[in-house]
Amino acid sequence: MKSSDIDQDLFTDSYCKVCSAQLISESQRVAHYESRKHASKVRLYYMLHPRDGGCPAKRLRAENGSDADMVDKNKCCTLCNMSFTSAVVADSHYQGKIHAKRLKLLLGEKPPLKTTAAPLSSLKAPRVDTAPVVASPYQRRDSDRYCGLCAAWFNNPLMAQQHYEGKKHKKNAARVALLEQLGTSLDLGELRGLRRTYRCTTCSVSLNSIEQYHAHLQGSKHQTNLKNK
């Protein structure tokens, strides 16, 4: 019996004897014969059955030497050491990832490097509010490199954007807004934030932060004392 007849008997359209696999559909058949598991079992089978002449791919190489043009590509791929039962299975293999990958390695091509860096066009410029807070002397022309309000430097626009949207900057901006709003009731040292206490002369009390000072001014006690003064 010829080796090709043996191959046809082992690998049919509905059953793979080497893998003991039932093949119901065309897609299942192609997927099975293309799989690495099948290729490994086929190589093992021919190693254990030398009377069949060994693996078809190896046998064709030995008979034809380095002349790859003499090999029937519909029956065997010498590059991947795989045998096929039909032209459809062979065509599926040659268009698959495994064959393409080995072909690139053979030609010395390197796979493309994946990059996670975002293109410059996708980077958003830092948002600059038009409110008086940001338009204060703390704001500089190079706001994408430095935040005068928080004394923070940036390496790129994306880092600047993240800073301006962060809690620290928003907290400092709100603090400056209160300072500017309360500028008429604070002395120069308090307005510049150089003091740790803020005094209300109307009520004769000292507050530890600008937030407490602002809350005190909105309170009923201060409003009452202000009216009675």
Curated annotation (Swiss-Prot):
Pfam families: zf-C2H2_jaz, zf-met
Keywords noted in UniProt: DNA-binding, Metal-binding, Nucleus, Repeat, Zinc, Zinc-finger
GO cellular component: nucleus
An annotated Gene Ontology molecular function: DNA binding
Superkingdom of the organism of origin: Eukaryota
Zn-finger region bounds: Matrin-type: 14-44, 72-106, 145-175, 198-228
Location in the cell: Nucleus
Annotated coiled-coil segments of the chain: none
Full protein name: Zinc finger matrin-type protein 4
Species assigned in the record: Mus musculus (Mouse)
